[in-house]
């Protein structure tokens, strides 16, 4: 799924929760997509050649930042995926929407 579409969907859900204004929701959605894409790139590097210590720290920092943005936006993290063939981050959206083969229990994926 294209990043713009993911951003639009996430932004709409963040606004529907009611904790953020539409502008803040759009900023949160853009940041989440950017961070998740960076995390996915590190997953690709890990699969191909392994991560250096610096890259491991970066990965941990990205996961921490993603959790912080999700908390501020009122969204719930389902899980992080280390497999570069799928989405890097899976969320539990309020209405149970999903976009992966894992179904509702896997959640809505971003970061590809």
Predicted feature residues:
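Acidic, low-complexity, intrinsically disordered interaction modules
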Residues: 37-40, 44-111
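Intrinsically disordered, low-complexity coil/linker segments enriched for acidic/polar
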Residues: 3, 21-22, 52-55
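Short, charge/polar-rich alpha-helical segments
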Residues: 13-36
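Residue-level signal for well-ordered alpha-helical segments
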Residues: 9-12, 16-19, 43, 52
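Short intrinsically disordered terminal tails
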Residues: 1-10, 23, 95-96, 106-112
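Short, compositionally biased low-complexity segments
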Residues: 3-10, 34-43
């Amino acid at each position: 799924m294209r990043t713009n579409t993911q951003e639009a969907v996430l932004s709409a859900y963040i606004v529907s929760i009611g904790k953020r204004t539409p502008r803040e929701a759009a900023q949160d959605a853009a940041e989440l997509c950017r961070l998740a894409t960076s995390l996915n790139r590190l997953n690709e590097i890990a699969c191909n050649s392994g991560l250096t210590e610096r890259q491991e720290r970066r990965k941990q920092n990205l996961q921490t930042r993603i959790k912080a943005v999700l908390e501020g936006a009122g969204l719930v993290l389902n899980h992080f995926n280390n497999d570069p063939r799928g989405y890097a981050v899976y969320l539990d959206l309020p209405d149970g929407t999903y976009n992966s083969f894992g179904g509702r229990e896997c959640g809505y994926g971003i970061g590809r």
